[in-house]
């Protein structure tokens, strides 16, 4: 629940992990996991879900969106440049990025000036079947996080006078 307040120390923590005898390090990252330091001679492949959104394209949603307190917003403002610099420096230690979408590959290129192969997350499509009869509503299944913009989906459905059902949990669930 309070992990966001520890964001400034995450880089310090991930860089303290020691992996002394591995030839290949695989990380799955949306924040700092890509910052793991591989051993000398070891390779690092990062499956990336997003560059550190808290300091890049979603900064306003996290720090200035009215959802954080004044102290948290000021803290984020103070640490933003330092975290961006660390994010770029740690990306340089990755040998190969694999993004979960073309959108994320574009962000890897934009923020890190690095190419990324694309490998979409696996989905077992055979487990899903279309319903015989459709119902008159939109369905949103998501985590209640600032960057997911659940509020925008609610607003859009209200304007269109359409029903919206939302399934999920997260820090913004009470909103």
Label every PLM stretch briefly.
Residues 23-24, 43, 96, 137:
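Structural motif
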Residues 24-27, 38-69, 117:
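Active-site proximal beta-strand in glycosyltransferases
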Residues 26, 93-101, 165:
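A short beta-strand/loop micro-motif in the catalytic core of glycosyltransferases
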Residues 103, 122:
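Carbohydrate-associated surface elements
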Residues 1-34:
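Active-site donor-binding segments of glycosyltransferases and PAPS-dependent sulfotransferases
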Residues 123-125, 129-167:
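Conserved donor-binding/catalytic core segment of Leloir-type glycosyltransferases
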Residues 29-30, 48-50, 101-102, 169:
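Helix N-cap/beta->alpha junction signal
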Residues 64-97, 105:
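Membrane-proximal helix-turn-helix segments that form the acceptor-binding/catalytic region
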């Amino acid at each position: 629940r309070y992990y966001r307040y520890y964001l400034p120390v995450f880089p310090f923590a991930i860089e303290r992990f020691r992996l002394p005898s591995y030839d290949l390090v695989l990380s799955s990252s949306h924040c700092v996991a890509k910052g793991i330091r591989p051993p000398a001679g070891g390779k690092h492949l990062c499956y990336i879900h997003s560059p550190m959104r808290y300091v890049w394209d979603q900064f306003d949603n996290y720090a200035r969106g009215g959802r954080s307190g004044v102290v948290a917003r000021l803290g984020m403002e103070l640490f933003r440049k330092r975290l961006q610099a660390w994010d770029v420096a740690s990306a340089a230690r990755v040998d190969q990025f694999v993004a979960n979408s073309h959108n994320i590959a574009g962000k890897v290129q934009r923020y890190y000036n690095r190419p990324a192969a694309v490998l979409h997350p696996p989905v077992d499509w055979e487990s899903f079947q279309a319903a015989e009869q459709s119902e008159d509503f939109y369905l949103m299944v998501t985590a209640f996080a600032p960057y997911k913009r659940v509020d925008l989906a609610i607003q859009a459905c209200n304007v269109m006078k359409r029903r919206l059902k939302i399934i999920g949990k997260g820090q913004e669930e009470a909103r």
